[in-house]
């Protein structure tokens, strides 16, 4: 009888272990490089010991390519920008609707939440919610370029050989706005948009002698700014915020036509297998102390109410040095990218690269 009891107990333990293994879950996260800091991942796994987080770092183009290749399989939570969801899903069927009742949306900034919902609603279903937001614009060393505030200043002969830019779609859009155009409105008229691109290409080719170098990564840009090789550049705001901590003369400058604003989101891949874990992660990073840790990692601002107050002190100082209330009101949010636009922009950029000798 004693042996029987021990055997039963042993079987029960094995069975319980099997159940535990069966209940274990993996959250496969497809995200940007700074959106899954090790400290937060560890903290999440400690709170939910039945969930293991696997992180794949990516960008907008790669996210679409990876999910397109698998039909939305291989990942449980993705973080595309708000303007890269609608067209990608309509074309490739890679996402599934979100259950907003599972998300603490009441802590989100209503303007950002409503904007993302509007951009990602398809057939009455919402496909994303906001995570963090930031901008692209200009950066200047105010001790050397105190009046720098227009996209066109990058090409001002006053700063010949002392400016930089990255040959990506942001500079095309910035130049378009500086020419008095609204490129986002022109998305609805591809002929009009091509005219705008042609003018931007001519302008940027003519600008090449003003450019010290075309930056490709944030580290390249930071080195040029800190060394004084350049006095201003087109940039992500997060790069400028980082440099502000090393030299308070280097500040992010919202262009006079408005900084270009993006919102990175949370979206569920169509064949994801861990929706509950995904919702837990979303709610976890919305908690105030985790918002601060995330912003410290990313340099971006959370899409929650009171986000400015939750920034680490150094980031808060950099943001306050960059933005006024009017600058915030003047933000130009990236619009949904319809099919065909990226191909047009890619060809425009190739023309500039060929003419300027940039790779």
Where are these predicted regions, by residue range?
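Periplasmic-binding protein-like
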Residues: 197-207, 245-270
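A ligand-binding cleft/hinge motif common to bilobed small-molecule-binding domains
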Residues: 83-87, 232-249
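Ligand-binding "clamshell"
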Residues: 89-97, 122-125, 242-254, 317
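Conserved C-terminal helix/tail region of periplasmic/extracytoplasmic solute-binding proteins
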Residues: 325-359
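Early extracytoplasmic/lumenal segment of secretory-pathway proteins
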Residues: 25-88
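A bilobed periplasmic-binding-protein/Venus flytrap-type ligand-binding module shared by bacterial periplasmic
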Residues: 137-144, 176-178, 263-274, 293-294
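Mature extracytoplasmic/periplasmic domains
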Residues: 260, 269-329
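Extracytoplasmic ligand-binding site segments that recognize negatively charged/polar headgroups
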Residues: 74, 82-85, 89-222
């Amino acid at each position: 009888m004693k042996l029987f009891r021990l055997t039963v107990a042993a079987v029960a333990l094995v069975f319980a272990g099997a159940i535990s293994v069966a209940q274990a879950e993996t959250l496969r996260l497809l995200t940007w490089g700074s959106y899954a800091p090790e400290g937060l991942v560890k903290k999440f796994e400690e709170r939910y010991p039945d969930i293991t987080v696997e992180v794949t770092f990516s960008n907008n183009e790669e996210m679409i390519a990876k999910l397109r290749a698998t039909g939305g399989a291989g990942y449980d939570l993705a973080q595309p920008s708000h303007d890269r969801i609608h067209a990608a899903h309509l074309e490739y069927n890679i996402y599934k609707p979100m259950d907003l009742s599972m998300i603490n949306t009441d802590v989100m900034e209503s303007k950002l939440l409503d904007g993302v919902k509007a951009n990602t609603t398809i057939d009455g279903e919402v496909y994303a919610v906001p995570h963090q937001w930031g901008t692209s614009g200009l950066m200047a060393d105010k001790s050397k370029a105190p009046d720098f505030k227009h996209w066109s200043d990058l090409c001002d002969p006053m700063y010949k050989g002392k400016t930089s830019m990255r040959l990506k779609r942001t500079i095309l859009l910035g130049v378009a706005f500086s020419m008095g155009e609204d490129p986002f409105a022109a998305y609805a008229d591809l002929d009009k948009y091509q005219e705008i691109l042609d003018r931007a290409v001519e302008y940027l080719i003519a600008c090449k002698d003003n450019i010290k170098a075309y930056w490709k990564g944030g580290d390249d840009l930071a080195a040029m700014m800190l060394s004084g090789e350049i006095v201003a550049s087109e940039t992500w705001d997060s790069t400028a915020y980082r440099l502000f901590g090393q030299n308070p003369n280097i500040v992010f400058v919202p262009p006079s036509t408005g900084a270009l604003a993006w919102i990175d989101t949370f979206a569920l891949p169509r064949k994801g297998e861990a929706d509950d874990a995904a919702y837990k992660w979303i709610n976890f990073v919305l908690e105030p102390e985790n918002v601060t840790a995330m912003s410290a990692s990313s340099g971006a601002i959370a899409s929650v109410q009171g986000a400015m107050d939750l920034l680490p002190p150094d980031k808060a100082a950099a943001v306050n040095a960059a933005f006024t209330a009017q600058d915030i009101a003047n933000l130009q949010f990236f619009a949904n990218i319809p099919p065909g636009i990226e191909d047009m922009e890619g060809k425009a950029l190739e023309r500039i690269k060929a003419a300027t000798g940039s790779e």
